[in-house]
Amino acid sequence: MKTFVAKPHEVQRDWFVIDAKGKVLGRVASEVARRLRGKHKPEFTPHVDTGDYIVIINAAEIVVTGNKAQDKKYFRHTTYPGGIRETNFEKLQQRFPGRAIQKAVKGMLPKGPLGYAMIKKLKVYAGAEHPHTAQQPKPLDI
C-alpha cells in the first residue's frame, strides 16, 4: 500500500465562519491554525497547503483570561535605530481589533513560503458583517 500524497491542484478547500464573540484568544487561534494548515483532513500532507479558508467575525469582542489584557505585550519595530515599540492587548484591541488574533494565528503556522500562503486564507473582521457570503461559509463552533 502506497502512502497518499496530496497534490496542490487536487485539494478541495471549504469556507468556514467563526464567531469569536466571548471566545478565548488562544483557543480560537489554535483551532484556526490547525484548520488553515489542513491537519483536520485525512489527506493532510506537510509540504502541501491543504487547509481551508477561515472567516473570523466579531474579532473586537474576543477575550483573554487573567490579567493578560494589561500584561500581554506586543512588539514592533519602526526600522529606525531605537525604534522598538510596545503595546498591550487592551490598546491593540482598541486600535486594531483583528490584529491580536492575526498575530496569534501567524505565530502558530510554519514560517516560510508555505506558512505565508496559509495566513492569506485567514480573513478577520471586527464586526459581524463580512463580504464573503458568496462563498457560502459554513458556521464552525469552537
Swiss-Prot record:
Q: Which GO terms describe its biological process?
A: negative regulation of translation; translation
Q: Which InterPro entries match?
A: Ribosomal_uL13, Ribosomal_uL13_bac-type, Ribosomal_uL13_sf
| Pfam family membership, one | Ribosomal_L13
Which CDD domains does the record cross-reference, listed alphabetically? Ribosomal_L13
Q: Among the entry's GO cellular component annotations, what is one?
A: cytosolic large ribosomal subunit
Keyword vocabulary terms for this entry: Ribonucleoprotein, Ribosomal protein
Q: Which residues form the signal peptide?
A: none
- What GO molecular function annotation could you give as one example from this UniProt entry? mRNA binding
Describe the protein's quaternary organization and the partners it interacts with.
Part of the 50S ribosomal subunit.
State what this protein does.
This protein is one of the early assembly proteins of the 50S ribosomal subunit, although it is not seen to bind rRNA by itself. It is important during the early stages of 50S assembly.
UniProt record similarity statement: Belongs to the universal ribosomal protein uL13 family.
Against NCBIfam families, the record matches this protein to: rplM_bact
Q: What is this protein called?
A: Large ribosomal subunit protein uL13
- Name its species: Bordetella petrii (strain ATCC BAA-461 / DSM 12804 / CCUG 43448)
> Its gene?
rplM
